[in-house]
From Swiss-Prot:
The keyword Nuclease applies. Its EC number is 3.1.-.-. GO terms for molecular function: nuclease activity. This is Putative pre-16S rRNA nuclease. GO terms for cellular component: cytosol.
Amino acid sequence: MEEAEKASQPHAGTALAFDFGEKRIGVAIGNLELGLAHPLVTLSNKNKEECLKSIARLMDEWKPVLLVVGLPVHADGTEHELTRRSRRFAHRLQARFGIRTVLEDERYTSISASSALDEASVRGRRQKQVLDQIAAQLILQSYFDQRNATT
């Protein structure tokens, strides 16, 4: 994170993170001062308008000062179609809600989330229900860790 970008980030308040997917969007919440992220909810993304209404309810309830959207890229850092869709999603969030929105590299978060859930004996249907919000938690925690490492 560049110094100018770091200076423009809020330092207090609530952050919401999103693991964007075609079918589901995982959401996590965290406190900027504490630098701790927690899974929150998984939203269905089958009906885009209903999904945006659900996100609007989360905005009203949690009053975030920052949004973090996972940016999926190939292992070598090259972009693909879901990268572009995630960027569009982030731009829509910022335009619709007027809240600073940043992108965070999400390489391997779903794999890490699945491994953590396997270790906790969460498998099958239950894992599918929470996998995306755990991935969002890892995205947000990565953002916090990187931010704190540069301060």
